[in-house]
């Protein structure tokens, strides 16, 4: 399904569910509240916004939704859960939004999801990948656009099992997404390779990585392979420091999200070769 078709269908459903019938016939726009980390994660959020704007243009050129134009109100939450919830409340109660979309970081997405479930607002989570978003912490009002972390970690576990590696080290941001990603990989890999060993687990703060210290810790554990969940600026620092110190030489690396253009392109000439990525 094309993004514009999906977006139109979702906005249509939300408008019918949340807008009084008397208001459906009005001429004003159907408003969607979009919350994201536009400054903090500009390399990802910028193209993401441009894609939405293109889809909105196509939808409105085709007659809009319920014969009304579709309008997005974009807000920056600075990557802070509390700020995101505050903005969500304002969008729904003051701006007249019929639904919420957005978020990249899982801790922010979980905060919006909890708020949406409590208030009965439809929330389309664009990028938060923590499995708990739609599993343990899920609710009937929250939907996710992306494939799950469980699925992507499972694919990498299959590749890791086929590599013949037995000793693994992991590095992941210490918040919900990173924790879910490591847990899913370990479960999937041990089901395929029962004698696999995890010799190190590194948990840098998200966007606060001390790459030198993390590389040293990984090297000391002498793994056969590394499972990486860092992304964005943390990934860039890890790749640079690990490359300079030879961490990846002769080792398999299995890495979540690192093949996506938003995270791969900024690495430029430092982009690692031979990694298995999603």
Task: Please give the residue ranges for each predicted region.
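Extracellular/periplasmic Venus flytrap/periplasmic-binding protein
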Residues: 86, 131-132, 139-245
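N-terminal export leaders
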Residues: 3-13
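Extracellular/periplasmic periplasmic-binding protein-like sensory domains
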Residues: 242-278
């Amino acid at each position: 399904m094309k993004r514009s078709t999906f977006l139109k269908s979702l906005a249509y459903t939300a408008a019918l569910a949340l807008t009084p019938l008397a208001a459906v016939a009005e001429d004003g726009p159907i408003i969607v509240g979009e919350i994201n980390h536009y400054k903090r994660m500009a390399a990802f959020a910028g193209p993401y916004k441009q894609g939405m704007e293109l889809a909105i243009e196509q939808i409105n050129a085709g007659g809009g939704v319920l014969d009304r134009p579709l309008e997005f109100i974009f807000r920056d939450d600075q990557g802070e859960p509390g700020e995101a919830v505050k903005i969500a409340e304002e969008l729904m109660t003051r701006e007249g939004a019929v639904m919420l979309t957005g978020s990249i970081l899982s801790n922010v997405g979980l905060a919006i999801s909890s708020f949406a479930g409590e208030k009965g607002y439809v929330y389309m989570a664009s990028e938060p990948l923590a499995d708990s978003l739609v599993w343990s912490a899920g609710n009937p009002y929250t939907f996710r656009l992306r494939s799950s972390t469980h699925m992507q970690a499972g694919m990498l576990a299959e590749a890791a099992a086929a590599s013949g590696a037995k000793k693994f080290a992991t590095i992941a941001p210490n918040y919900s997404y990173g924790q879910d990603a490591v847990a899913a990989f370990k479960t999937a890999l041990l089901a395929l390779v029962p004698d696999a060993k995890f010799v190190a687990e590194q948990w840098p703060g998200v966007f606060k990585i001390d790459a030198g210290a993390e590389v040293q810790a990984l090297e000391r554990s002498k793994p056969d392979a590394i499972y990486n969940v860092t992304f964005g600026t943390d990934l860039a620092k890890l790749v640079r420091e690990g490359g300079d110190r030879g961490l990846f030489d002769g080792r398999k690396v299995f890495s979540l999200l690192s093949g996506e253009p938003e995270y791969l392109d900024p690495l430029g000439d430092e982009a690692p070769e031979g990694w298995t990525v999603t």
